[in-house]
């Protein structure tokens, strides 16, 4: 069985653990059943969730059994934020989001194939509404609440911060009871003895450990453990997982596969070594080789390309990744634009300077106007100079006539035009 702790330490993933020697021994004696919770606070997971989802997968590949727990019940409340009360979403919305998260999480782990005998390391995908939905108010207060100290709960950093500001509802104040009880139920039902989560979850996770000790006195499945992962920050000080257009989602309807690929491909050279260790399943030797290439030949972006391809394939599938790569090549003159998947081309053009216009192709203005309206050049006179100097392209064909207009035959898939200034500046026109 692979020493998963050594691997996680090398990758810089471990923030805190309970007694490391005890945890290492339990893992060596394994397989250990572990879990991570994912609350449906939105209709999709985003790239920030990948750290936990992929860490679960690393444990599975090391010979352990992961449980991905979707918070169908805890999502009705939401883990308290440091600055403000969460908006409560309707039960119908939560149910829809739970379904979305289950579908997304299923792509990271290996489950028992239908009709097959389960293996000890086959993953489980559970919903805490299964037990929390049956919990009564009296049961919560009598059987769970009596094990919690108000003094300790008030000392929690999030609670203190909120009480110093706008305050906190009892609903959010009691969230820790529910998350802690999740650990108890998974311990009882599945012999789960390890919970993982982000470093901000340390207090909630250790509260679950205490509750197991209090409710399961003799600990029939052995002692429970906790492990949190490090907070991921970017070298430029901005928040990981955010772009100018917002969060980078795993749902292709919210973030296109093309935009997802470009997010990783555009990673800062200072960040890519850490990203490789946290998000890639490549071996230590492969990662160190890519890190060296970044140092020696940064312009090649070999590490960024490798990670973008690996994660796009993992999240969106091999075919979508191929579509994205072909689109990236074709946009910059190294492929045939007409052969691209229309959805991929449309998504790609929305990630570059573009303009969306209504009407027919006959109603479109001259090309110099289109170049200016996309922002590829600052003005129509600049567009004319670019054409005269041989630096303007329509669908990768050089434009030589400053009076040129677009024809029906120029439209890709009946609605797209790809404009380019020089080798690297790409823009687009999308007909509605």
Swiss-Prot record:
Keywords: Aminoacyl-tRNA synthetase, ATP-binding, Cytoplasm, Ligase, Nucleotide-binding, Protein biosynthesis, RNA-binding. ATP binds at residue 242. It is an enzyme of class 6 (ligase). The keyword ATP-binding applies. It catalyses: tRNA(Tyr) + L-tyrosine + ATP = L-tyrosyl-tRNA(Tyr) + AMP + diphosphate + H(+). Its EC number is 6.1.1.1. The keyword Repeat does not apply. GO terms for molecular function: ATP binding; RNA binding; tyrosine-tRNA ligase activity. It comes from the Bacteria. GO terms for biological process: tyrosyl-tRNA aminoacylation. A motif ('HIGH' region) lies at residues 40-49. It is found in: Cytoplasm. L-tyrosine binds at residues 35, 175, 179. InterPro entries: aa-tRNA-synth_I_CS, aa-tRNA-synth_Ic, Rossmann-like_a/b/a_fold, S4_RNA-bd, S4_RNA-bd_sf, SYY-like_C, Tyr-tRNA-ligase, Tyr-tRNA-ligase_bac-type. Belongs to the class-I aminoacyl-tRNA synthetase family. TyrS type 1 subfamily. Homodimer. HAMAP family: Tyr_tRNA_synth_type1. NCBIfam families: tyrS. Catalyzes the attachment of tyrosine to tRNA(Tyr) in a two-step reaction: tyrosine is first activated by ATP to form Tyr-AMP and then transferred to the acceptor end of tRNA(Tyr). This is Tyrosine--tRNA ligase. It comes from Thermobifida fusca (strain YX). The lineage of its organism: Bacteria, Bacillati, Actinomycetota, Actinomycetes, Streptosporangiales.
């Amino acid at each position: 069985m692979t020493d998963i702790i050594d691997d996680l330490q090398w990758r810089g993933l471990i923030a805190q653990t309970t007694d490391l020697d005890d945890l290492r021994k339990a893992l060596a004696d394994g397989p250990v059943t572990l879990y991570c919770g994912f609350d449906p606070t939105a209709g999709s997971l985003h790239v920030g969730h990948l750290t936990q989802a992929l860490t679960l997968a690393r444990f599975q590949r090391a010979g352990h059994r992961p449980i991905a727990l979707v918070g169908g019940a805890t999502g009705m409340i939401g883990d308290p934020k440091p600055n403000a009360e969460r908006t409560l979403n309707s039960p119908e919305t939560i149910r829809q989001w739970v379904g979305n998260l289950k579908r997304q999480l299923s792509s990271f782990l290996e489950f028992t194939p239908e009709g097959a005998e389960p293996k000890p390391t086959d993953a489980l995908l559970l919903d805490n509404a299964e037990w929390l939905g049956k919990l009564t108010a009296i049961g919560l207060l009598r059987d769970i609440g009596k094990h919690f100290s108000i003094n300790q709960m008030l000392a929690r950093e999030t609670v203190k911060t909120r009480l110093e500001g706008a305050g906190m509802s009892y609903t959010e104040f009691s969230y820790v009871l529910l998350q802690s009880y999740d650990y108890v139920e998974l311990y009882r039902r599945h012999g789960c003895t390890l919970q993982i989560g982000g470093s901000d979850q340390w207090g909630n996770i250790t509260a679950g450990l205490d509750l197991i000790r209090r409710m399961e006195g003799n600990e029939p499945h052995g002692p429970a453990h906790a492990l949190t992962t490090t907070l991921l920050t970017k070298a430029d000080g901005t928040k990981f997982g955010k772009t100018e257009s917002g969060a980078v989602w795993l749902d292709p309807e919210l973030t296109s596969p093309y935009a997802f690929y470009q997010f990783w491909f555009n990673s800062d050279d200072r960040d890519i070594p850490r990203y490789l260790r946290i998000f890639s399943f490549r071996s230590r030797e492969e990662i160190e080789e890519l890190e060296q290439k970044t140092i020696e030949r940064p312009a090649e972006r070999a590490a960024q390309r490798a990670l973008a391809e690996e994660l796009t394939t993992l999240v969106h599938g091999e075919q979508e990744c191929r579509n994205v790569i072909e689109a990236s090549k074709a946009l910059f003159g190294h492929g045939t634009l007409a052969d691209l998947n229309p959805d991929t081309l449309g998504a790609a053009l929305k990630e570059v300077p573009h303009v969306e216009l209504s009407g027919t192709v006959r109603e479109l203005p001259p090309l110099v106007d289109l170049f200016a309206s996309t922002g590829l050049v600052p003005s129509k006179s600049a567009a004319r100079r670019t054409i005269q100097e041989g630096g303007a392209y329509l669908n990768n064909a050089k434009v030589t006539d400053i009076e040129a207009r677009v024809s029906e035959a120029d439209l890709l898939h009946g609605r797209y035009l790809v404009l380019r200034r020089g080798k690297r500046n790409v823009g687009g026109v999308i007909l509605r």
